[in-house]
Amino acid sequence: MQQDYSIPTGKELRIAISGASGCGNTTVSSILAKQLGIPCINYTFRNLAQELGLPLEEVIAQAKTDFRFDRLVDERQIERASQSSCVLGSRLAIWMLKQADLKVYLYASAEVRVARIFQREGGTLDGIRNFTAMRDRDDTRRYKELYNIDNTDYAFADMHIDTEHYKPDLIVELIIDELLRRSLILPREAE
């Protein structure tokens, strides 16, 4: 597939995209990385659970008291993101990837997030609503205890995008427009 954009010669580009579960983080990060022709790094508790052969719920439950899981996920993400140009999509990307050229925070209401997770994973709406609320609380507490990060304070991000009102492709267009505005990427014909 021919890429429409390029990174200026001799430069690298690192984009950090964060948001709570159901905000479109993984989808937007994947589409953006594909359009830019750079790797997408989205290593999560879900990946770690698969790697360890454990159910996701068990990893999440153990992570409440054992910070080893967070550290493993975060170390692997930062290690991979430090190697080359990439899009890093994770809950803490905008806080952890200090060298990111662009930091984007995606958000949506709890009800929209729950509906998206329900559509993606199935289950019951009440079960997902309760699990998502618990996970949000636990994530906020753990990040504060582990890294002294308040994941409810994302004012420093370069872009804040309400994903309730935009489809993933349009969100990617908004991010690409900002990358072009900052001269972090160039239209292919400008090479």
Language-model features: where?
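Glycine-rich phosphate-binding loop of ATP-dependent small-molecule kinases
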Residues: 1-59, 68, 82-83, 99, ...
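Active-site cofactor/cluster-binding pocket
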Residues: 2, 77, 82, 100, ...
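Small-molecule kinase domains that catalyze NTP-dependent phosphoryl transfer to phosphate-bearing small molecules
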Residues: 125-174
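ATP-dependent small-molecule kinase phosphotransfer cores
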Residues: 39-97, 111, 122-130, 137
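Short loop/helix-cap segments at secondary-structure boundaries that form the rim of catalytic
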Residues: 94-100, 152-155
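Internal catalytic or translocation cores that form aromatic/hydrophobic pockets or channels
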Residues: 35, 100-105, 111
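Acidic donor-binding loop at a coil-to-helix junction in glycosyltransferase catalytic cores
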Residues: 113-118
